[in-house]
Amino acid sequence: MIAMSTMDDELNEIRKRRLAEIQRQQAQNQQSDIQAAYQQEQAKAEMEAQKQAILRQILTPEARERLTTLKMSRPAIGEQLEMQLISLAQSGRLPSQISDEQLKTLLMKMQPKKRKTSITRV
């Protein structure tokens, strides 16, 4: 009877140690996940700041305002236009700042042609 009791005590002790080890590993994994997410967020924020700095240089205030409005209503098109503008600027194909009218023209070129259909009653 005494031997069973000591075996149970030993098993309980092993279980406690294993549980403590698992909890420690989970805490370490959680900490590294938090650090990775933080670093990813920092890189994303830095990239966004660089993008905004470039756009400030190549767009007039009115054009920037239009782009901001576009990004709120249609984020995918706004992002696509931003990337296109930045690539044009980096390749040196923009002689001056882009005005609101020029931005509208670029937007029109990006939009697919819509077919007009009309219904006539006989």
UniProtKB/Swiss-Prot annotation:
Keyword DNA-binding in the entry? The reply is yes
> What top-level branch of life does the organism fall under?
Archaea
Identify the Pfam families for this entry.
Answer: dsDNA_bind (PF01984)
Give a GO cellular-component term. cytosol
Q: Which GO terms describe its molecular function?
A: DNA binding
Q: Which family does it belong to?
A: Belongs to the PDCD5 family.
SUPFAM superfamilies reported in the protein's UniProt record: Double-stranded DNA-binding domain (SSF46950)
PANTHER family cross-referenced by the UniProt entry? PROGRAMMED CELL DEATH PROTEIN 5
Ordered alphabetically, the record's keywords are:
DNA-binding
* Protein's organism: Methanosarcina barkeri (strain Fusaro / DSM 804)
In terms of InterPro entries, this protein maps to: DNA_bind_arc, PDCD5-like, PDCD5-like_sf
Query: How is this protein named in the record?
Result: DNA-binding protein Mbar_A0455
